[in-house]
From Swiss-Prot:
Residues 145-164 have a biased composition (Low complexity). It holds the Pfam family RIIa. This is Calcium-binding tyrosine phosphorylation-regulated protein. Residues 74-107, 135-164, 247-279 are annotated as: Disordered. On the 2D-gel the determined pI of this protein is: 4.3 to 4.6, its MW is: 97 kDa. The keyword Calcium applies. It comes from Vulpes vulpes. GO terms for molecular function: calcium ion binding. GO terms for biological process: sperm capacitation. Coiled coil: none annotated.
Length: 498
């Protein structure tokens, strides 16, 4: 009986073609098998056109030997660099830990190294030595003992007692709570005797100065009153002050007014200093750090103050020298064009300037003071209406006896600083700032007294600065008396408007 099912006949060469493309796919391992099979058969058709006489089996065999082997070599060369890169990446990643045990996995381990630092930093005190040697600075910065970056105990380290810390260093704990407690009063006051310390946060390593030192700069912008006792004819002022420069470390004043200075004819060595809590310990300055300033005073005619010059602060060990530089001093007065009388002014500047007045030119030796100023002024007063009136002097309590008349005038001073080491060489400041002063003139018989005050006096008719005990009136020299007799004074009917 004949079967009705059709028989499938496999064409010749189909098995050979399928085996060839399968071997090529297994050998090359392409990413896209369909596209690779299409390229395979296209290349096989092109290869057959050049070899038409070959059988299908021989054709596939030669095609594999020529074409497929080249394809496999090319893919192998391309895969080799990729494998090398994968191996390198794998080796780099393998160096980092991929697992962490829960017993050692704490919050401190998850913090990066640069972001976490538990070290104690100590900084030297600014008041101990302002100028440090370059070799000592790294040693002072590294004075704190380092601690491990990841301590086993979670509790912060206890801060040492303030007594165990040196006077030149301030302990700054890394823990915010301990730092706040230490700043609130666990350490000694910075105003105590010889225990001045400067608290600097770990995050801010910039050296800073205390507010007491910076408060002295605020007084420079204020007006300064200079009470002066002068004769009715001609006034020639000469101020001499010898003192060592020091800066008070007391509390900052609430207002802009500073403590007024006093005048005395005796040197500063004979006077007693304020209490120790109000100022830093005084140490005499050496001769190599003296600063000499020259002042030239001249009269002007307009009522507008010419303000120029600048003040600078020179820091030296345990002292801060605040000399005035580049100021123009002049008397606001309608001055007649008469021959001026030169007046030499040697003044030592300090936080509390003590000056004695003389009408003669005086020479000051350099060893008396660390800062000197020399000035020349041309001052002419012709007000005979005040002649014959007694002088006015304030008593010890601050009240004044109104005996003479007072006239305010504005004074502007110009300073040029000279260092004694450089003879004849001026160190002039490029910029200039202004300092306006008010002068009150009080009639006196035959003497003139000028008191430089650091207080801010805004009213010309205010109470004058008290004159301390021991204020003497110097006598006129013969040269000055001769100059007065040559007619430098106007007639009695003419008055000078100040």
């Amino acid at each position: 009986m004949i079967s009705s099912k059709p028989r499938l006949v496999v064409p010749y060469g189909l098995k050979t073609l399928l085996e060839g493309v399968s071997r090529a796919i297994l050998k090359i391992n392409p990413p896209n098998i369909t596209q690779f099979a299409a390229v395979y058969f296209k290349e096989l058709i092109v290869f057959r056109e050049g070899n038409t006489s070959l059988d299908i089996k021989d054709l596939v065999k030669q095609f594999h030997q020529i074409k497929v082997e080249k394809w496999s070599e090319g893919t192998t060369q391309e895969k080799e660099p990729e494998c090398m890169e994968e191996q390198v990446e794998t080796s780099v990643v393998s160096q980092e830990p991929t697992r962490m045990e829960k017993s050692t996995d704490t919050e401190e381990d998850n913090i990066a190294g640069p972001l976490f630092m538990n070290k104690t930093t100590q900084f030297p005190s600014v008041h101990a030595e302002v100028l440090l040697e370059p070799e000592e600075t790294p040693e002072a910065a590294c004075g704190g003992s380092p601690k491990p970056s990841t301590p086993k105990a979670v509790t912060p380290p206890s801060s040492p007692s303030p007594a165990a810390v040196s006077q030149e260093f301030a302990y700054v704990p890394a823990d915010p709570a301990q730092f706040a407690a230490q700043m609130l009063g666990n350490v000694s006051s910075i105003h105590s005797d010889q225990s001045d310390v400067l608290m600097v946060d770990v995050a801010t390593s910039m050296p800073v100065f205390s507010e007491e030192v910076l408060s002295s700069e605020a007084a420079e912008d204020a007006r300064v009153a200079i009470p002066s006792v002068y004769s009715a004819e001609v006034v020639a002022l000469q101020v001499l002050s010898q003192t060592s420069v020091h800066v008070d470390l007391g509390p900052k004043p609430k207002d802009d007014e500073a403590e007024p200075t006093t005048a005395s004819s005796f040197p500063l060595q004979d006077e007693q200093d304020p209490p120790a809590y109000d100022q830093a310990p005084e140490v005499p300055l050496q001769a190599d750090i003296e600063v000499t300033s020259f002042v030239h005073v001249s009269s002007i005619y307009n009522n507008e103050p010419v303000i120029e010059g600048v003040t600078y602060v020179e820091q030296i060990p345990e002292h801060i020298v605040i000399p005035f530089t580049d100021h123009v001093a002049s008397l606001k007065d309608n001055e007649p064009p008469d021959s001026p009388i030169p007046v030499a002014c040697d003044t030592g500047m300090s936080e509390k300037t003590v000056g004695s007045v003389s009408l003669a030119q005086l020479e000051v030796e350099s060893h008396y003071s660390s800062v000197h100023m020399e000035a020349e002024a041309s001052v002419l007063f012709s007000d005979t209406s005040l002649k014959g009136q007694p002088a006015q002097f304030p008593d010890a309590g601050g009240s004044t006896k109104a005996v003479g008349s007072e006239k305010p005038l504005h004074l502007e001073v110009e300073f040029t600083a000279l260092v004694p080491g450089n003879s004849g060489q001026e160190e002039s400041q490029g910029s200039s700032a202004a300092q306006e002063m008010e002068v009150k003139l009080v009639l006196s018989g035959e003497a003139a007294t000028a008191v430089l005050s650091a207080a801010s006096v805004r009213a010309a008719g205010g109470s004058p600065t008290p004159v301390p005990e021991g204020l003497t009136e110097p006598e006129l020299e013969p040269e000055l008396e001769a100059a007065l007799e040559q007619g430098l004074m106007k007639p009695d009917a003419e008055t000078t408007t100040v």
